[in-house]
Amino acid sequence: MAPIVPVASVAPVHLSGPKRSSRSVYILLIPGLAWLAVFFLIPLFTLFMTSLQKESASKPGTYVFGIQLSNYANALAEYWPQFLRSFVYAGLATILALAIAYPLAYFIAFKAGSWRSLMLVLVVAPAFASFLLRTYAWKTILADDGVVTSTLNSLHLLPDGRILNTGIAVVAGLTYNFLPFMILPLFASLDRIDYRLIEAGSDLYASPAKVFWRVTWPLSMPGIVAGTLLTFIPAAGDFINAELLGSAKDRMIGNVIQTNFIEFRDYPTASALSFALMAAILILVFGYIRRSGTEDLV
């Protein structure tokens, strides 16, 4: 009978390296999560609780905690025209921004050559000026005695004889102020397209229009979706353009929220309008992303 040879015991392997590494990742997340909680989640929760408050019976003008869901119904019933106007203006500004930005982004990506860097700097340059200052500049440009209005009046293109204090001025201001947010995502998306694919379409005797709609446009869809979202979302909640470039009948929901917060101090109504606007935008955004077939963006 052969002798039994004892098998040497194998020391257990400790995977301290990967565990320690994953633990370090979670530790690094703490500052970001703390910042998100303090400056986003807690204020958001506070705003939501404020939207449910009711007016104190003993002290008119002050509000106490309560579950007052009628705040939402009353706010929407009173201010639905401003809601609708905000989405219409934001939608028009987004469409105009896309129509202006796409050819420019295409030119920078494929045709600019050595001028590419300079053109990108010029696209970003307006952002170095204050948003408020840029809007005031448009107020001067579109003034009744300005060159733009005088020229259009001489051509009989303005039925009201003016641009300032109209919805046209508000949409123009929104388009201009948020145009860089449309150009940059489009450029990034177009710049990733292999130009040989476009050349291949031409080699297969496809017309330029067919190459664009079958090749370039689908491949640039992530940039289109990102650009339209980055333009539409802030435009829908904007109040500066309507305040400076529009009239009382051109007020957007952002103006109503500002007025209720600062002037009327009707905090429940203002908070309810803010949450309703947020919910409406989220519904539109998710529907738009699903319809465009770019669910991977979320």
List where the protein language model places each region.
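C-terminal transmembrane helix and the adjacent membrane-cytosol boundary/short C-terminal tail
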Residues: A2-A11, S16, I27, F187-I198, ...
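N-terminal signal-anchor/first transmembrane alpha helix
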Residues: A2-T46, F107, S117
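Cytoplasmic-entry segments and transmembrane alpha-helices of multi-pass inner-membrane transporters
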Residues: V25-L29, P103-I141, I198-E199, F212-W213, ...
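Transmembrane alpha-helices
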Residues: P31-A34, F39-F40, V121, A125, ...
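Short membrane-interfacial helix/loop motifs at transmembrane-helix boundaries
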Residues: F40-Y79, I141, D145-G146, G246-A248, ...
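Glycine-rich helix-loop "coupling/hinge" segments at transmembrane-helix boundaries
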Residues: K59-T62, F239-R265
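Membrane-interfacial helix termini and adjacent extracytoplasmic/periplasmic loops
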Residues: T62, T135-T175, A209, L245-K249
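Transmembrane alpha-helix signature in integral membrane proteins
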Residues: A77-F110
